[in-house]
Amino acid sequence: MTDSGIRTHQESITVQVSPDDLYDLVSDVTRTGEWSPTCTACWWDEQADAGQVGAWFHGRNEVPGRTWETKSEVVAAERGREFAWAVGGNLVRWGCELAPAEQGTTLTETWHFLPGGIELFEENYGDQAPDEIADRTQQALDGIPRTLAAIKRIAEAG
């Protein structure tokens, strides 16, 4: 059995745009494929609920040798401050926290591998769960700085 505690990571970058403008970008999940190294596309389940807490969206992820889709629920949506979603409702929580900075906005991307995700991996992968969890953790650690750099480039290009 693996450690079922929450695994977390976060990194920040300063972006030369306002918190509201940056929020408008990162909360548009249909643009995720422009900056994510893994998620190639996202779409809202119900356009009328898009961007609101409780709204659901699907994402398509690709890594060498594997493609899969996820369903996520928006769990935080406060313009200029935070946008976050939970994959599968309780498996992994991703978020973007925004704070005014002297020169623009500090954008912090957060990642939490939740106990529900650990349990699912243990059920699905058995003895291989620790390796699979380590692999997904490494993908997040590698992807976050790449994602932040891409968001900065896109936001500052206007």
Predicted feature locations:
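Hydrophobic ligand-binding cavity/cleft-lining segments
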Residues: 1-52
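A generic helix-loop boundary/linker signal
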Residues: 12, 47, 64, 130-134, ...
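Solvent-exposed residues in well-ordered beta-strands and their adjoining turns
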Residues: 14-18, 60-64, 99, 110-114
